[in-house]
Amino acid sequence: MKVKPVTVTGSSLTIEDVVAVARHGAEVKLSADAKKRIKDSKKIVDDIVKSGKPTYGISTGFGELSTVTITKDQNGALQRNLILSHACGVGNPFPEDIVRAIMLLRLNTHASGFSGVTPSVPDILVDMLNKGVIPYVPEKGSLGASGDLANLAHIALVMIGEGKAYYEGKLMEGKAALAKAGLKPVVLSGKDGLGIINGTPVMSGIGALALHDAEQLLKAANMGASLVFEAFRGITAALDPRIHKSRPHKGQIDTAAFILKMLKGSSSINTRENDVQDPYTLRCVPQVHGASADAIAYVRKVLEIEINAVTDNPLVFPDNHDVISGGNFHGQPIAITMDFLGIAVSELANISERRIERLVNPQLNGGLPAFLIENGGVNSGFMIPQYTAASLVSENKVLAHPASVDSITSSGNKEDHVSMGTTAARKITEIVKNVRHVLAIEWLTAAQACDLRGVKKYGKGTGEMMKLIRKHISKVTEDRILYNDIMKALEIISNDENIDMIENAAK
């Protein structure tokens, strides 16, 4: 997949840019204007170091130690020691795409020119991204204020030639990884250490990728529901645009319209005799999926602001030579948003699992064989995939409990309220994985039901779905290892190109 380079300006980054850099290796460039702003703000910091003017994190200690004066000669040690002491994350390492997203967002903050870092700091971030030096970053340890200190410190370690990093697929010492890539460690001064580790790029980087996945899962959920409509010969009156215009939530209107497009041309819909309405899991898809769609759209708006925001502290304003301490590092906007996203995405799986149950249950599936298998008894068919889906949605109910309602004091009670935003973001990555599996099971189950129903002519979109599914997964005629089928279905819906192809077919 060929992707365009991403030019970092400090204010124009998109969610799509983050995905391109994090997952597709897009080249990163720093704009000329950004380079100038970085130099201008660094001069202000240099003046403070020389003068000894009391300024947080430059001529003072950190947190509760902010009353301790730091001399000019101690400044370099202050910045280096900050990194060494704060690199205490634990747990499994973040995957490569998340680390790359984090690095890009930290670079974008520096590009704004309000961080006061040495130009070599953003330069090495650019080089590490482009040459594939990926720091080993433990996933746990952030309180979400003052930002993501512990996690970001592990990235900073590699930048100064410490810590560990991956290079060409191998984990090695950070200094060795830099050397193999032809890079040299940076020497920190001024406000560099604080400028690297203070802020919200970890929770925002995770969130940006999770948002992209959520948007694709929403499409996959609508597609899965459309195929279930085919299997149940669903009644499309509930999708009538007049109903949805009378309750004009955008997500609801868009969902109903999309499913109608998916089903256009189908010969199976609206063919049940003596029945005028479907159960809620079909009839209310626009209302349920639509509510998730609106929540996801809100999350995009928040993240588009945050990934272009300056979440460092203190901030340097070169125009009037001011350096001001504030609280932009506090992750509450992202914490609440990630919790919201988790709830919205979880609900897509909740209703999907109920459709799966309705498909396999002989008392509910409208005359299809029990568990969608002929010669049941000796064959169990799709009995246990529904168990798996039920297990995953139940796990998500635990994961969807909000992290942002929690707080705990730290740093001698100086930092007496925190966001837990990175915990919220980490949870959504697990929720997304679980939802993707549930939707894969729904696609697989719905395709089996359609074959057993004997659908003669599919809709524009559902027909494309069936062709894609059956290209990789044959109809189940006797028991086999369904794990393999689920993994194939998972691969199908995880591929953005497949989702886009079906979406285009339904237009």
Curated annotation (Swiss-Prot):
Superkingdom per UniProt: Bacteria
Keyword tags: Cytoplasm, Histidine metabolism, Lyase
User: What GO annotations for molecular function exist for this entry?
Assistant: histidine ammonia-lyase activity
Which pathway is it part of? Answer: Amino-acid degradation; L-histidine degradation into L-glutamate; N-formimidoyl-L-glutamate from L-histidine: step 1/3
- GO cellular component term, pick one: cytoplasm
**Which locations, inside or outside the cell, does it occupy?**
Cytoplasm
Residue list for modification 2,3-didehydroalanine (Ser): S146
Q: PTM comment for this protein?
A: Contains an active site 4-methylidene-imidazol-5-one (MIO), which is formed autocatalytically by cyclization and dehydration of residues Ala-Ser-Gly.
Q: Give the matching Pfam families.
A: Lyase_aromatic
- What is this enzyme's catalytic activity, as reactions? L-histidine = trans-urocanate + NH4(+)
GO BP annotations listed: L-histidine catabolic process to glutamate and formamide; L-histidine catabolic process to glutamate and formate
Crosslink 5-imidazolinone (Ala-Gly) sits at which residues?
A145-G147
Q: Which Enzyme Commission number(s) are on file for it? A: 4.3.1.3
NCBIfam families linked to this entry: hutH, PRK09367.1
Family the entry assigns: Belongs to the PAL/histidase family.
Tell me what this protein is called.
Histidine ammonia-lyase
Annotated organism of origin: Treponema denticola (strain ATCC 35405 / DSM 14222 / CIP 103919 / JCM 8153 / KCTC 15104)
Lineage of producing organism? Bacteria, Pseudomonadati, Spirochaetota, Spirochaetia, Spirochaetales
